[in-house]
């Protein structure tokens, strides 16, 4: 496949999170049940540490479960699946492409939001998203839907490959067309020249639609993919604004990089005041996180300029600009001086291996600290990276004052960290194929594990284990411990570019072509019996 553009995807105070209506053991958004986006599945026990994906039935791409081990079910996706899986209220949502066409009235290259039944993996409905007419400069062919859906009650929020923020009914059209948006039949054929489609109960139902290209003039570079965060009645998203095909020009330097929308109506409520546009290295593919610092909420965002920002979540009206702004609280340049200029003082140009990078990973807020790593588009290859732990209680430019610790042993990374609250260990993968284990408080390195292949997804910590896969299809289970212990290594028959997730005692691993639900009944029963005995 040419130019795999995105795992740049390669996702509140108690009671303030709308997705609390999902079951506590669900995984309703990128980061599970925490707006801090820590890749940790709290309360998960009895998860499998060994499994086999099984063989395909002869002449098909259907998994023969009799040849598998600890596989509850396996569902066919498309041929490229980068978006991370979310699970809420008995439904699974995952992004993919249309190469495994489920409906003949929607042929050709499309992005797909797929909804499956959590218990069986059976198909429930899909939202078909047509490709942008402008082509690969904004919407690279065959990539599919890259955003990890966010579920809040009976609504789902996602950034489409058309650079839209969509609010969607989790039941699709099966319970009618709820509106106010009623033009789904037209939408699914946008830019195709086809008349409105005849839709049914297995098609998606859009509640509202906010087109960031039309409304804000943004210019996404090759792909749009932010995983939305919902805080109270507000939706926050990265706009994916970036460079054009020349890789030297930002067509819309004044367009915002980060916005707030009304969760019920989709109305624009605010945009960032950071002025990131002119300084974008390449594209912008980070997703926001949220935390409460000294009683005040902060939104954390990794910019395409290599700077990590904290914004006040409450928009403030600016009379001079006649705009509502999300005001900066602090900002931190994550590129050390030696990544910007060499020993002779000469500027190191992006995207040189020894040079500066943007931030594609999601900032993680944990224990009143913010963790973030730098990296680049995987097409740019390997290079130097930087992992930092920041103090979010500071104000203004905290590049000099805000570092609690930093780690330059990591290479370029588009992965989000995972921290185990039980032992204070931090795990993070990098694009060069290394899994790093550090002390989250001090930054002390404990060990490095070599996967021997590029890694796009993030580590997941759950049940005392660390789960992670790579682009060769290798999937490892490591012990969450200061001593490196490999519990198992499994080969899946397709690359793994996304992050494993856990919901209701089941581990989900998405390859490019299949979603596997992994469950060890014996271990799960033993864990349940142990809890009951206590």
PLM regions: where:
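Bacterial N-terminal signal peptides that target proteins for export
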Residues: 1-10, 18
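C-terminal segment of classical bacterial N-terminal signal peptides
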Residues: 14-23
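Noncatalytic, solvent-exposed loop/strand surfaces
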Residues: 22-534
């Amino acid at each position: 496949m040419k130019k795999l553009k995105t795992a740049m995807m390669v996702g509140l105070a108690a009671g303030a999170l709308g997705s609390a209506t999902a079951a506590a053991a669900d995984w309703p958004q990128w980061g599970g049940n925490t707006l801090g986006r820590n890749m940790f599945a709290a309360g998960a026990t009895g998860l499998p540490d060994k499994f086999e994906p099984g063989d395909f039935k002869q002449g098909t791409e259907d998994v023969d479960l009799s040849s598998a081990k600890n596989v509850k079910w396996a569902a066919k996706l498309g041929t490229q699946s980068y978006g991370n899986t979310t699970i809420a209220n008995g439904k699974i949502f995952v992004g993919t492409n249309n190469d495994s066409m489920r409906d003949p009235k929607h042929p050709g290259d499309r992005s797909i939001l797929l909804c499956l039944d959590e218990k069986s993996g059976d198909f429930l409905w899909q939202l078909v998203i047509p490709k942008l007419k402008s082509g690969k400069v904004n919407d690279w062919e065959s990539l599919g839907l890259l955003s990890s859906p966010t579920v809040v009650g009976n609504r789902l929020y996602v950034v489409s490959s058309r650079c839209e923020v969509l609010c969607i009914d989790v039941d699709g059209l099966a319970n009618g067309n709820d509106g106010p948006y009623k033009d789904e039949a037209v939408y699914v054929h946008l830019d195709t020249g086809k008349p409105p489609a005849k839709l049914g109960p297995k098609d998606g139902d859009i509640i509202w639609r906010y087109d960031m290209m039309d409304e804000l003039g943004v210019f996404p570079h090759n792909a749009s993919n932010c995983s939305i965060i919902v805080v109270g009645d507000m939706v926050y998203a990265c706009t994916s604004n970036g460079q054009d095909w020349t890789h030297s020009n930002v067509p819309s330097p004044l367009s915002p990089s980060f916005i707030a929308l009304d969760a019920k109506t989709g109305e624009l409520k605010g945009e960032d005041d950071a002025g990131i546009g002119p300084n974008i290295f390449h594209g912008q593919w980070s997703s926001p996180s949220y935390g409460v610092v000294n009683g005040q909420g902060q939104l954390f965002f990794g910019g395409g300029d290599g700077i990590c920002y904290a914004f006040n979540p409450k928009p403030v009206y600016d009379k001079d600009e006649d705009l509502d702004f999300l005001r900066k609280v602090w900002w931190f340049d994550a590129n050390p001086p030696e990544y910007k200029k060499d020993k002779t003082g000469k500027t190191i140009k992006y995207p040189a291996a020894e040079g500066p990078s943007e931030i594609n990973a999601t900032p993680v807020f944990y224990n009143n600290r913010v963790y973030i790593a730098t990296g680049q588009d995987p097409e740019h290859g390997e290079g130097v990276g930087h992992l930092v732990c920041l103090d979010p209680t500071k104000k203004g430019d905290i590049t000099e004052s805000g570092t609690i610790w930093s780690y330059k042993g990591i290479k370029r990374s588009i992965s989000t960290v995972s921290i185990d609250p039980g032992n204070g260990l931090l795990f993070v993968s990098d694009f060069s194929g290394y899994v790093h284990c550090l002390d989250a408080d001090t930054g002390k390195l404990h060990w490095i594990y070599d996967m021997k292949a590029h890694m796009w997804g993030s580590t997941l910590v759950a049940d005392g284990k660390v789960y992670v896969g790579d682009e060769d299809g290798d999937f490892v289970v490591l012990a969450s411990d200061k001593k490196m212990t490999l519990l198992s290594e499994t080969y899946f028959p397709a690359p793994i570019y996304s992050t494993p997730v856990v919901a209701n005692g089941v581990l989900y691993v998405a390859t490019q072509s299949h979603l596997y639900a992994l469950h060890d009944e014996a271990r799960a029963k033993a864990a349940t019996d142990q809890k009951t005995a206590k």
